[in-house]
Amino acid sequence: MPDYTWFEGIPFPAFGIPKETLQNVCNKFVVKEEDLILLTYPKSGTNWLIEIVCLIQTKGDPKWIQSVTIWDRSPWIETDLGYDMLIKKKGPRLITSHLPMHLFSKSLFSSKAKVIYLIRNPRDVLVSGYYFWGKTTLAKKPDSLGTYVEWFLKGYVPYGSWFEHIRAWLSMRELDNFLLLYYEDMKKDTMGTIKKICDFLGKKLEPDELDLVLKYSSFQVMKENNMSNYNLMEKELILPGFTFMRNGTTGDWKNHFTVAQAEAFDKVFQEKMAGFPPGMFPWD
């Protein structure tokens, strides 16, 4: 299997994301007003967000999340299976994507469909990605974390540059149909984030229903739910030692980066993210 599928200069996982599907998403897929789109750069808390949104839709009833796999509940639009599922689906759709803005369906930008964009400290994204991609057959294997830091800073990782992904999608942050969430805030005040999502979606949940959403979307419960923990992922795609839900914490990068790596990262971050208001990002 090749290291990546390259499309428009961006590396994508080598399995399940053909160029034809990427072209179709960009040029043919029609976003409907009632769709809800969950956007993230990989390893930013995507599955946690999906779980919370699914539980909000069922008012905390866990039957759906315990009986249907996460990739069937909210298909990844850029995968061949997800795309086929979404174009056949009637009614409102829950859509997941890691796509950069310029490769997403053009129809989104003239639509009132709601978008939730979740971002996470890129240092933690990097460490999580290093462990995740390294234990799959979906991407090129780095020989060390140091190598992966270099690749990440150059955008030579699945879905390309974190910096470009964030800069582009954040251009929508003032729109009424766009909700920006931070992984760090979700960890610190999960209930507050759940309520924020409810408000954005116009969903009114009772206190006991909100408690159920919180309970069934917890890290421990998700880790034990085979519909959400990727235990059902195709075995040829994973290597020994693979674990999808590793630790779900914030600040883990401090246990991995050397001082030199942290300084190199900070330098690139300052350059690439220049122009955003102070306090825009809630991490150190």
Swiss-Prot record:
It holds the Pfam family Sulfotransfer_1. It is found in: Cytoplasm, Cytosol. GO terms for biological process: steroid metabolic process; sulfation. Induction: The ST activities display gender- and age-dependent alterations and are known to be under the regulation of gonadal, adrenal and growth hormones. It catalyses: an alcohol + 3'-phosphoadenylyl sulfate = an alkyl sulfate + adenosine 3',5'-bisphosphate + H(+); glycolithocholate + 3'-phosphoadenylyl sulfate = sulfoglycolithocholate + adenosine 3',5'-bisphosphate + H(+); taurolithocholate + 3'-phosphoadenylyl sulfate = taurolithocholate 3-sulfate + adenosine 3',5'-bisphosphate + H(+); 3beta-hydroxyandrost-5-en-17-one + 3'-phosphoadenylyl sulfate = dehydroepiandrosterone 3-sulfate + adenosine 3',5'-bisphosphate + H(+). Disulfide bonds: none annotated. One of its GO terms (molecular function) is bile-salt sulfotransferase activity. The active site is at H98 (proton acceptor). Optimum pH is 6.5. One of its GO terms (cellular component) is cytosol. Transmembrane segments: none annotated. It comes from the Eukaryota. Its EC number is 2.8.2.2, 2.8.2.14. InterPro entries: P-loop_NTPase, Sulfotransferase_dom. The keyword Transferase applies. Belongs to the sulfotransferase 1 family. Sulfotransferase that utilizes 3'-phospho-5'-adenylyl sulfate (PAPS) as sulfonate donor to catalyze the sulfonation of the hydroxyl group of hydroxysteroids and bile acids. Prefered substrates are dehydroepiandrosterone (DHEA, also known as 3beta-hydroxyandrost-5-en-17-one) and 3beta-hydroxy-5-cholenoate, but can also catalyze deoxycholate and its conjugates, and lithocholate conjugates, in vitro. Oligomer. This is Sulfotransferase 2A6. It comes from Rattus norvegicus (Rat).
